[in-house]
Amino acid sequence: PDGTMITTHGGGTSRKRMHAAKDYSGAEIMRTLRDEVLNRGIPVVDFTSAIELILDENGNAAGAVLLNMETGEKLVARAKTVIIATGGAGRMHYQGFPTSNHYGATADGLVLGYRAGAKLLYADTLQYHPTGAAFPQQIFGALVTEKVRSLGAKLVNCDGKVFMHPLETRDVAAASIIRECTDRNKGVDTGSGKAVWLDTPMIERIGGEGTIEARIPAMLRMFMNHGIDIRREPILVFPTLHYQNGGLDINVDGMTPNVPNLYVAGEAVGGIHGRNRLMGNSLLDIIVFGRSAGRNAAHRAAETVPAKLTLNHVAEFEAQLKAAGIETEAVSPKLLPDYRRK
């Protein structure tokens, strides 16, 4: 009422450092960005993905080959600078885990950048969000926001016992849940695997009636769509692939050191947080480093003189694979997970 921001704790934090638009923060960020694009009249080409970067004869990034995924038409986009902002890799489903990511999260930017000559950092590290929905199957892997635990929900095993502090760092929390379900055999059988309870009714025991609807309405709606009232019933959760710690190497300007004029922003960047991160810190990838990449790419574009376009780096990459004795039938970038084509 007095205009003070509501803040809460996140996993691993010693201070309240999380502020949210209820539990619609991601949607609010997307709405604001889309409004800005529309208001400024920035052209957007829907259903069209980059399938190869284009370099010029001097080895600078100079555009991309695009694929219209509706018509199959291929287009060439010329550019003085290029920004990769393709997000994560959860839809690769590493080690068979579910994911909270959108369907386009197939590490395409990493593939394109690496093939063009950019270096990768920490590509072997991914963050599992401790609480992905484990039941019902229709929302398997969907994010159950950290805010649920911040408001007081506890993680409980099949014996009804709290087995860990609810706001440990994400790696510790995810490992604890997996251990409870495997090594200790204290998970709950969901019909498609094991999970643990997240005691959501505790939120209203602590905060009073109406807290869930006021603070996490998206969670309430998601489960109510499947007949589960989280105000009265606990929910089943299990770790879900959430964030790609690794990515493409950049300098302080957001540009890849090995490929001039190629910039990276967002989750496709590697090394900003090292091999792990706290909740909320991923926003630095876009708000701080994304803004820097955009500004620097614009300044550099103003002084870049276009040169002849080539795809020579693709032939060089194929030659390197052959020289290393690597044979593969893999097609990349994937654009969408394999099961979308079945």
Language model: regions and residue ranges:
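Flexible, glycine/charged-enriched surface loops at secondary-structure junctions
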Residues: 1-2, 44-47, 120-124, 192-193, ...
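Solvent-exposed alpha-helices and their adjacent loops that cap or buttress functional pockets
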Residues: 36-44, 54-59, 69-78, 136-137, ...
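An anion/pyrophosphate-binding glycine-rich loop and adjacent beta-alpha core
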Residues: 112, 118-229, 233, 296-302
